[in-house]
């Protein structure tokens, strides 16, 4: 049996752009992607802390160090510039792999610079 587990998480990203007229996706600073082991075209779930929206799309890498978090296409309807979002990727693991899997988690500051890298997510973590 395979289990779907969180593989990477970008916590408290601030939306810098929303481009309704783009074909689709989310553009993410490629330095952030590298830190959480997310890849171009990988499926991600985005949770908007401001309005509760949850959407799925795929990643387009942005300029490294730019701090860009841009929702494109229809996804742009679910955010406003300045909204705080959580971006998560998932992977399929065997039951044995799932027991020891440790996702990569980064917490961003208000300018989308990596503030902290968490080795794991503890229950009742408050940031």
From Swiss-Prot:
Q: Which residues carry this modification: Pyruvic acid (Ser)?
A: 25
SUPFAM superfamilies to which the protein is assigned, alphabetical: ADC-like
Name the coenzymes or cofactors required. pyruvate
Locations listed in the record = Cytoplasm
Q: Which cysteines does the record link by disulfide bonds?
A: none
Tagged with keyword Cytoplasm: yes
GO CC annotation, single: cytosol
The UniProt entry, under InterPro entries, shows: Asp_de-COase-like_dom_sf, Asp_decarbox
Source organism, top-level taxon: Bacteria
Bound cofactor: record note: Binds 1 pyruvoyl group covalently per subunit.
Q: Pfam families this protein is in?
A: Asp_decarbox
Provide the GO MF annotations for this entry: aspartate 1-decarboxylase activity
Q: What does this protein do?
A: Catalyzes the pyruvoyl-dependent decarboxylation of aspartate to produce beta-alanine.
NCBIfam families assigned: panD
The subunit field of the Swiss-Prot or TrEMBL record says:
Heterooctamer of four alpha and four beta subunits.
Q: What is this protein called?
A: Aspartate 1-decarboxylase
Which source organism does the UniProt entry give? Listeria monocytogenes serotype 4a (strain HCC23)
